[in-house]
Amino acid sequence: MEALVYTFLLVGTLGIIFFAIFFREPPKITSNKK
């Protein structure tokens, strides 16, 4: 059961970070890099 909690925490943290980056910079990264 501990593994489930750790996985949930990891996914939650990654999701929050991804959301923060996505909202901070619009999806123009591919356009900017090319």
Swiss-Prot record:
Keywords: Chloroplast, Membrane, Photosynthesis, Photosystem II, Plastid, Thylakoid, Transmembrane, Transmembrane helix. The chain crosses the membrane at residues 3-23. GO terms for biological process: photosynthesis. It is a single-pass membrane protein. The gene is psbT. InterPro entries: PSII_PsbT, PSII_PsbT_sf. This is Photosystem II reaction center protein T. GO terms for cellular component: chloroplast thylakoid membrane; photosystem II reaction center. Belongs to the PsbT family. PANTHER family: PHOTOSYSTEM II REACTION CENTER PROTEIN T, PTHR36411. SUPFAM superfamilies: Photosystem II reaction center protein T, PsbT (SSF161029). PSII is composed of 1 copy each of membrane proteins PsbA, PsbB, PsbC, PsbD, PsbE, PsbF, PsbH, PsbI, PsbJ, PsbK, PsbL, PsbM, PsbT, PsbY, PsbZ, Psb30/Ycf12, at least 3 peripheral proteins of the oxygen-evolving complex and a large number of cofactors. It forms dimeric complexes. The lineage of its organism: Eukaryota, Viridiplantae, Streptophyta, Klebsormidiophyceae, Klebsormidiales. It is found in: Plastid, Chloroplast thylakoid membrane.
